[in-house]
Amino acid sequence: MQGILSIQSHVSFGHAGNSSAVFPMQRMGFEVWPIHTVQFSNHTQYQEGWTGRAFAAEDISELVRGLGNIGALEKCQAVLTGYQGSAEQCLAVEDTVAKVKQANPNALYVCDPVMGAPDKGCIVAPGIAENLLTRLMPMADVIVPNQFELSQFAEMEIHSLDDAITACQRALAKGPKVVLVKHLYCLENGSFNMLLATQEGIYLAKRPQFEFAKQPVGVGDLISAIFTSGLLKGWSPKQAFQHCHDACYGVLSATYHAGEWELQTIAAQQEFVEPSKHFPIEEVELEMA
């Protein structure tokens, strides 16, 4: 039985981390083997707080050893990683990816390098950003950063589309084959913008921006999950990007019109299979030097 190993946070209530990623991948036809880096009652934006704890790096390694014992690693189609709770967890992930690639050289590694955002800066514990930037992102086949995380990896500021393209090209030169920028803030103009960069081309996607009273959490996790599933279906990066963009819009639309804060992942599940709305993807023409 083939599957996707998803190593990220988990909440009991709502949809963030694995709670946002696992079901969409299952709905798109994939077995998913979740390993949680933290387990909380709810996401951390609730003013009432949250309960739960982070797991030790050894907890991750122990579960991966167990999967190896039953021969599951050679059947692993992809490793998807998101929020990591410690620098040591990043090292456990690095070791896990190496083990999976050794067991199945065709397995993908998709890294969602959760670090922060332009308005918040770096929000992760000491050592995590460094390990993401120097260890996990360079070894990934696909990275799914936001604009802030891309700027950190490319070691440059991003203020325009041209800047973002240059940053993506720098990122591709460091190892990844695909860069999906899950939110390009510098183009804010009433639309939500995403950018895809591969060696074959660069593509821009725009969709209407919903004016939520409180921004839903877990959207980036959802984007990474749908995109990973699309690639594993054998779609080209552009096709997976198109599907991911349209499906995410459908979930956000359902969430907005329901007046909810938590993503309406279950109610909008048909979007993962057949998005209800289609937005054209624009290929960005690169200026020749």
From Swiss-Prot:
Taxonomic classification: Bacteria, Pseudomonadati, Pseudomonadota, Gammaproteobacteria, Vibrionales
Species: Vibrio parahaemolyticus serotype O3:K6 (strain RIMD 2210633)
Residues noted as binding substrate in the record, renumbered to the chain: 9, 44-45, 221
Pathway: Cofactor metabolism; pyridoxal 5'-phosphate salvage; pyridoxal 5'-phosphate from pyridoxal: step 1/1
Reaction(s) catalysed (UniProt annotation): pyridoxal + ATP = pyridoxal 5'-phosphate + ADP + H(+)
Cofactor(s) it depends on: Mg(2+)
Binding positions for ATP per the UniProt entry: 112, 144, 149, 182
Transferase listed as a keyword: yes
A single Gene Ontology CC term: cytosol
Oligomeric form and interacting partners: Homodimer.
Any GO BP: pyridoxal 5'-phosphate salvage
Sorted UniProt keywords: ATP-binding, Kinase, Magnesium, Nucleotide-binding, Transferase
Protein's name in the database: Pyridoxal kinase PdxY
Family: Belongs to the pyridoxine kinase family. PdxY subfamily.
UniProt GO MF annotations: ATP binding; magnesium ion binding; pyridoxal kinase activity
InterPro entries: PM/HMP-P_kinase-1, PyrdxlKinase, Pyridoxal_kinase_PdxY, Ribokinase-like
Biological role stated in the UniProt entry: Pyridoxal kinase involved in the salvage pathway of pyridoxal 5'-phosphate (PLP). Catalyzes the phosphorylation of pyridoxal to PLP.
Catalytic activity, EC: 2.7.1.35
